[in-house]
Amino acid sequence: MYKRQAPAHPLLAEQWADLNNNANLVFGYESPDGAHWLATTDDAIRDAWQSAFDTSDADAETARCLITGKEAGIARIHPAIKGVMGAQAAGAALVSFNAPAFCSYGHEQGANAPVSEYAAFAYTTALNLLLADRNCCQRIGDTTIVCWAENASPAYSNAMLMFFCGGAEARGVSESDLAAALKALSQGRPVSFLDDKLDPNQNFYVLGISPNAARLSVRFFLHNSFGQFAKNLQDHADRLSITRPAFDKRENLSVWALAQETVNQRSRDKNPSPQLVGDLLRAILTGGPYPATLLNGVTLRIRAEREVTRGRAAILKAYYLRNYPTELNKEVFTVSLNESSNVPYVLGRLFSVLETIQSVANPGINATIKDRYFNSACATPATAFPTLVKLAQKHLQKMSTPNEVHFSKQLTELMAQLPETGFPARLSLPEQGAFEIGYYHQTQKRFAKKNEEE
């Protein structure tokens, strides 16, 4: 009937071809006083339409929806979610039951986790829309991070991904401006960013999802104010802050850069553990303790390579300051060299000085005491340091008088801070961390002085 009458209607005649070609149609209303509004904005109309939609399939199984809490027709199969990196190109399911072993109480398919047709359509449509917008999502390892603000402003997700993953300069934002914005938001102050005003009280959501064949798994789903997320990120950045080599131009270390410090870069598989990346992401965003696997991974790489890089030193510092915030750790794990009398820290500094003495006495040497003695000096100082100190005395004799006086003074000052009982027999894991930080600080001070002289 309508197909015969509608084309002849004067208001529809000109647009009928478009309307009849799979176009979307929105109904509106004009009140007697001339006001216009869309039918889709009226709560009563929306509820009536949804009620009709929920009961349109008489054969559909009804149950209480786990999302809306209302009795409605249950989605037997949920729509596919596309755009998750690493998942099937055709899409993957967040909720699916494709074998009897996964079902309970005689239910089939979606009835095992009842979600209404509307809710299934709504969450998959919204998630697909966000995944299609590269300003809202970022991949780190096998985890795809999707974030959004409650007011739907893209500036919030843009800023969060810059804070979290870097890449600010590629989007026309300087590192200094980004750091200033993060600091202001972490202190609860609104800032202007990307032609928008960021409100620290704005509700913000972060979802982490990972692919597994035809399914998706939720690594985390976090909700907080944008300002609280900013504070957690600022605290993380402050804990990571440490003196860096002159060649390292990075202002901040991204999550991926931190995870890479746990990987053997000479191995075939250079990807960090997906579980580690997910746990690290959650710890940073929530302000919670860092995962023990992060410390274990870094410690293993230091032992294997006998190298304390900026990233590894930053991880050690951040880990102990967050997970064990004692006054002693706050004294030892600082940004740059400090005069702490903590024995493991002093031993790390001493080892660096002994290595320098050897290098100055033997220019062009291919291997230093670090290659042979670092691990034993770090774990069992009493077995390594007596030999190293004796060796240093021989190296001092090869030097010119100014160098000999300079390094002898350094040795004397550091040795004076050690206990009268001598070198410790062994160091615990936290003490080994202090040793490695002391070694890193002293070594960076030496390199900084060398660069100034050049």
Where do the model's predicted regions map?
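Short metal-coordination and nucleic-acid-contact micro-motifs, chiefly zinc-binding Cys/His arrays
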Residues: 57-63
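Short Cys/His-rich metal-coordination motifs, predominantly Zn2+-binding knuckles/fingers
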Residues: 68
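Extended alpha-helical scaffolding segments
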Residues: 1-51, 55-56, 72-454
